[in-house]
Structures are given as C-alpha cells and as structure tokens.
UniProtKB/Swiss-Prot annotation:
GO molecular function, one term: translation release factor activity, codon specific
Keyword Chloroplast belongs to the record: no
Protein name as annotated: Peptide chain release factor 1
SUPFAM superfamilies: Release factor
The gene coding this protein: prfA
Subcellular location: Cytoplasm
Record bears the keyword Protein biosynthesis: yes
Family, as annotated: Belongs to the prokaryotic/mitochondrial release factor family.
C-alpha cells in the first residue's frame, strides 16, 4: 500500500477548520453556498483523517501496554485481544483515505448523455435496447435523477433502434461511465417456436454532459439543416420544419433532434454535439496516458463486450471484472448498484496499485 501523504492530510484538516470558522462567521449567502459545497466535499476525508489519528494513538497505547513488564496478566490479555481489531480498523482507514485522495475525474460530478443503439440481432436487439433504457431509467429514478429523451428511433417490433437521453443529477457520470460498451443478451424470443436461445446485442455510450465552458463550438464549424419531423409510417407530425440536423464540419459528427419545437431541437442537438466533442477530447487525453491503457474497466472502449445478460439462467456476467450475479430480474428493474459499485471499486484498486508501484 502506498504511503499516506501526511503533508496533504494536514493541509486538508487546516482548510476544513478554516471553512468551519468562516461559515460560523455568517458570510454573504453566495459565499456561504460555495463554502458549504467545499465543506461537504472535504468532510468525509477529514473525518477519516481524524479517526485515523485516534486509531494510531490507540495502537501506540496498546503496544506500550504490552511492552511494559509491569502490566498485569488481565490487562495484557485484554490488550492482546483488542490490538488486532484496532490495527484492522487502522488499515481500513488508511485505505479509505487513499481512495478519497485519488485523483478525481473532473467530469464525475456532471450529468450525462446516455446513448443506446441496437446492434446485431435485428428486432431482438431493438427490444433489448429498450430493456436497457428502462433499466437505466429505473436506476436513475431511484437516485432522484431526471431522465429526458432527446431523440429516439423505434424498432419494428418495439424497443429502440436508437435512443439518446440526458440523465441529470449530481454525480451521474461517476456512476454510469463504466456502462459504455457492448451489452449482449441471450434469451428465447417470443416469436421462437422451437425454444432456441438467440443472441443479440446493444451498444451503450455514456458521455459527460458538456457545458459551453467545457468545449467551444464555433459557428463557422457547424452546418444546421432543418427538416420535417416524421412520425410512425413516415407521416408528418406537423406542417413546419422542426427537426434539426447539426453537422460539425471539422470532425464530421452529425447530431439530429426531432421534437416538435425547432428551438428546443437546436438546443438539444447542440447539447449532444458539445458532449460528443468533449468526450472525444477526453478519449484522446486518456489514450495518451499509459496508466489508463492498462485499466480495462476504465478504458471506455465502446467496441468491447462488457456484459452478458442470460435470461434462461437469470444470470448477468460483467466480463471486465469476472463478476457473475444471478439477479437478472432485479437488475432489469434498475437494481444495478452492486455491479456499478464493484466496477468503481475495481477501478480504484487499480489506481491504488499504480500509486503503490510509483511509491
């Protein structure tokens, strides 16, 4: 385990104390809001640092008691029993602090753009894409996040050929970023008379939602085309040109939004375009970091098969961390915390291991 950065820990405690004092002094409302945000960010790690100090003192006291030849047998026995528990607590606190002090992904606190596209498997792939969207929608609802569909293309038998949505809330990207990749499903279609299992797939992409300050999109770099929105069967929803297609000329990226309001469509399409460009910048930066290339969980390779959903066996397997759960029904209802948390823990363990190698 890497050595704890004592100087940094002391600085965090000092800053936390300073924030407490300034908040108690009754600053202006806007200043108070900023201080409160920093306070809530620092509180978990400072709490762990203070508990670490108490645990270190407790270990030192117990060892001193055991080293003292005048300690009676009863006290010695109690100290010998207590020491392993305190040392285990100390080790846990050290690991917790190291995780808290890991370099933060600047995008973690952002909302996200969720894109799901049917892959191989025709109608079954579209149905599965719909199942995945509902799974994430329920997961988001459980977190108090807001989901808004930006654009969608329905499959012939239901589900979606493609669906793009915003998931808005604090820390959305940190929870969903490891969902990017190919999701494979194995199940017996309703139309299958012989009971044969079919395999199909859908691709998920999760992008941090970019704001105007994150990425600049110059007016001369885009072409905006308006079209008539089409409903089921190609019928026009209205008589005005409302669908918007934005092409980013330098990269060739094309984004379309086809809701009823042209103004909303332009804003939504720009929102997705900014997020895709921001994601491209992040992917480029990540590929230049050898540490990220070593991390399979953190690679974000959207061509990689990351998870298999086997309906006949009620089994879900995440291939990146070799995690298998027989909770498919519950997961499809949005209960994906166990997989999400395991992926985050694996990524953090990889970061800690790299710090240990550098120490």
């Amino acid at each position: 385990m890497a050595k704890l950065p004592v100087d940094k820990m002391r600085e965090l405690e000092r800053r936390f104390g300073e924030i407490e004092a300034r908040m108690s002094a009754g600053p202006a409302a806007d200043v108070y809001v900023k201080l409160a945000s920093e306070y809530s960010e620092l509180q978990p790690v400072v709490k762990a640092i203070r508990e670490l100090g108490l645990a270190e003192k407790e270990v030192a006291d117990l060892k001193a008691l055991l080293a003292d030849k005048s300690t009676d047998r009863e006290m010695r026995d109690l100290a010998e029993m207590e020491l392993p528990d305190v040392e285990a607590r100390l080790e846990g606190l050290e690991k917790e602090i190291q995780i808290q002090l890991l370099p933060k992904d600047a995008a973690d606190e952002k909302s996200a753009i969720l894109e799901i596209r049917a892959g191989t498997g025709g109608s079954e792939a579209a149905l599965f894409a719909g199942d995945l969207f509902r799974m994430y929608e329920r997961f988001a609802a459980g977190k108090g996040w807001k989901v808004e569909v930006l654009s969608s293309s329905e499959g012939d038998a239901g589900g979606f050929k493609e669906i793009i949505a915003t998931v808005t809330g604090r820390g959305v990207f940190s929870k969903l970023k490891f969902e990017s990749g190919v999701h494979r499903v194995q199940r017996v279609p309703d139309t299958e008379t012989q009971g044969r299992i079919h395999t199909s797939a859908a691709t998920v992409a999760v992008l941090p939602e970019a704001e105007e300050i994150d990425i600049e999109v110059r007016a001369e770099d885009i072409r905006i085309d308006t079209m008539r929105s089409s409903g089921a069967g190609g019928q026009h929803v209205n008589t005005t040109d409302s669908a918007v297609r934005i092409t980013h000329l330098p990269t060739g990226l094309v984004v379309t939004s086809s809701e009823k309001s042209q103004h909303q469509n332009r804003a939504k399409a720009m929102q997705v375009l900014r997020s895709r460009l921001f994601d491209m910048e992040r992917q480029r930066a990540d590929s230049e970091r050898s540490a990220d290339r070593k991390s399979q969980v953190g690679s974000g390779d959207r061509s990689e098969r990351i998870r298999t959903y086997n309906f006949p066996q009620g089994r879900v397997t995440d291939h990146r961390i070799n995690l298998t759960l027989y909770k498919l029904d519950r997961m499809m209802m949005g209960e994906i915390d166990e997989v999400v948390d395991a992926l985050i823990a694996d990524y953090q363990a990889g970061q800690l291991a790299q710090l240990g190698e550098q120490a």
